[in-house]
């Protein structure tokens, strides 16, 4: 929004500096201001639409984090790149309701996916006998949301985590 306002002011300033005195009634200024007001209203409407969608998705999942799949099957290294390019991150559920939202995506696609498990003592949902480093150094979640050690070379469902701080 600031960029739009600054662009409008720059255009107006350029117009005035170039000595255009053919606008004694201020028609150009009024036109620029009207355009800026329309853009501000459109931006506000878009922002409110975004918030509505975010709140609805959060309400439906019980989590402020959104877990989204592009339905591709990739290894861990490819997942890191895909999630970063999309503006998200590798899933890292920290609470039970976040893990449930993540597991819902896996159940819907009938697939397993990578996730990151922190060492900070936060919520984890390890399956019985896990973690087992012999199985690999990465972590995957099954369709029920239970965590298992796995190879980072496995090809699993691409799921990225997105969250918003507003």
From Swiss-Prot:
Tissues expressing the protein: Expressed by the liver.
Residues carrying covalently attached carbohydrate according to the record: 122
UniProt-annotated location(s): Secreted
Signal peptide: 1-19
GO MF annotation, one: carbohydrate binding
Matches recorded under Gene3D superfamilies: Mannose-Binding Protein A, subunit A
Source species, domain of life: Eukaryota
GO cellular component: extracellular region
Stretches assigned to the C-type lectin domain: 46-161
Predominant subcellular localization, coarse grouping: secreted
Disulfide bonds: 83-160, 138-152
Cited Pfam families: Lectin_C
Alphabetic keyword roster: Calcium, Disulfide bond, Glycoprotein, Lectin, Phospholipase A2 inhibitor, Secreted, Signal
Described purpose of this protein according to its UniProt entry: This phospholipase A2 inhibitor binds directly phospholipase A2 in the presence or absence of calcium.
Family stated for the protein in its record: Belongs to the alpha-type phospholipase A2 inhibitor family.
Assembly, per entry: Homotrimer; non-covalently linked.
Protein name, entry field: Phospholipase A2 inhibitor B1
Lineage, opening ranks: Eukaryota, Metazoa, Chordata, Craniata, Vertebrata
């Amino acid at each position: 929004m600031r960029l739009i306002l600054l662009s409008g002011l720059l255009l107006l300033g350029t117009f005035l500096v170039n000595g255009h005195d053919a606008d004694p009634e201020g028609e150009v200024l009024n036109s620029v201001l009207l355009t800026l007001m329309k853009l501000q209203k459109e931006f506000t409407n878009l922002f409110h639409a975004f918030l509505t969608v975010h709140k609805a998705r959060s309400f439906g999942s019980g989590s402020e984090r959104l877990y989204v799949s592009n339905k591709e099957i990739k290894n861990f290294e490819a997942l890191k790149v895909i999630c970063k390019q999309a503006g998200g991150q590798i899933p890292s559920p920290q609470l039970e309701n976040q893990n449930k939202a993540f597991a819902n995506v896996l159940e819907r696609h009938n697939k397993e996916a990578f996730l990151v498990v922190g060492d900070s003592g936060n919520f984890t949902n390890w399956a019985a006998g896990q973690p087992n480093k012999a199985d690999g150094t990465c972590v995957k979640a099954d369709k029920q949301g239970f965590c298992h050690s796995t190879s980072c070379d496995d090809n699993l469902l691409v799921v990225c985590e997105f969250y918003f701080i507003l």
